């Protein structure tokens, strides 16, 4: 009887340790996908921060890598031209996805990273590959009016809006040095969605 009681108590303790560890880790949910096609490799790593009690539901940081062995040699990496430039631009991509729930389709006309108010922002489509995309400044928020004809509509269900912000490698290095991520999203209706969280990016090998 005593042995059974001890084993039961041990099981409860193990469950509690797992539960609290899981909760702590779940502040940022990590996911990694590796896809191979022929000799090429595509790696997609996502870091998801969940918000509570807000229309802003998730901040997702995404690092995507494309590895093409024939392009990895030194001569190719120093080459010029569309193909070489495109590969250098696409080999590692950093972006934030902001997920906002509403009963309307939203557009976002501005994104402000506190501390970098003078950052150079572009507003073109995030189509890949493309000459405009390769000329990425500090970050790109896409065309805020791409769904303008739907802005006036209200729906009887939740609309899951996603704002994709692609950031340059140079700008990513600057963001990684911050202690906190303070970001403001401004919608087409001038509504502000404010983020102020601990910067989790330095904790990972990015």
Swiss-Prot record:
The keyword Transcription regulation does not apply. GO terms for cellular component: cell outer membrane. Residues 1-19 form the signal peptide. It comes from the Bacteria. It is found in: Cell outer membrane. Its main location: membrane. Pfam families: BPTA. Virulence-associated protein essential for survival of the bacterium within the tick host and therefore within the natural life cycle of the spirochete. Belongs to the BptA family. This is Protein BptA. The gene is bptA.
